[in-house]
């Protein structure tokens, strides 16, 4: 009787341990530190350049900017290249609702980049844009 009880308890402990290990790996056992950062070559390979756009702001100022979009995969890069017209539309639409003082400074640019990333990601079916880089910026 005691031997059967010990075997049952041992089996239960093994099952609990296996479930715990599985949950650890499935639910994100990787910490941010353990995830490898992309090399610069990988970033460049998975990025899309958006040609310079000149448009009016809500405040009647003119802005000229160019951006680079970093994607999470080759598939999302390919899709993004096909959707370049939607990306340009998203940039122009966001800027049309923006005053010059809203986009000046680091905080304004970061807000614009986040809004643009969210809008572009809503179009994508394969992957996502991970980062938006402003590569040229001229506000008049």
Swiss-Prot record:
GO process terms (BP): bacterial-type flagellum-dependent swarming motility; chemotaxis
Transmembrane segments: 7-27
CC terms in the record's Gene Ontology section: bacterial-type flagellum basal body; plasma membrane
Organism superkingdom: Bacteria
Presence of the UniProt keyword Transferase in the record: no
Pfam families attached to this UniProt entry: FliL
Localisation per UniProt entry: Cell membrane
UniProt keywords, alphabetically: Cell membrane, Chemotaxis, Flagellar rotation, Membrane, Transmembrane, Transmembrane helix
Membrane topology: Single-pass membrane protein
Biological role stated in the UniProt entry: Controls the rotational direction of flagella during chemotaxis.
PANTHER family, per the entry: FLAGELLAR PROTEIN FLIL
Family stated for the protein in its record: Belongs to the FliL family.
Protein name: Flagellar protein FliL
């Amino acid at each position: 009787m005691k031997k059967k009880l010990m075997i049952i308890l041992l089996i239960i402990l093994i099952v609990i341990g296996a479930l715990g290990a599985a949950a650890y790996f499935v639910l994100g056992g990787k910490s941010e530190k353990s995830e490898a950062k992309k090399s610069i070559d990988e970033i460049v390979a998975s990025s899309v350049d958006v040609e310079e756009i000149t448009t009016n702001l809500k405040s009647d100022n003119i802005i000229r900017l160019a951006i680079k979009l970093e994607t999470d995969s080759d598939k999302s890069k390919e899709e993004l290249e096909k959707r370049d017209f939607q990306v340009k539309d998203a940039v122009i639409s966001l800027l049309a609702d923006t005053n010059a003082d809203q986009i000046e400074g680091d905080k304004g640019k970061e807000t614009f980049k986040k809004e643009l990333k969210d809008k572009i990601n809503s179009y994508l079916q394969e992957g996502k844009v991970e980062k938006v880089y402003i590569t040229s910026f001229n506000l008049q």
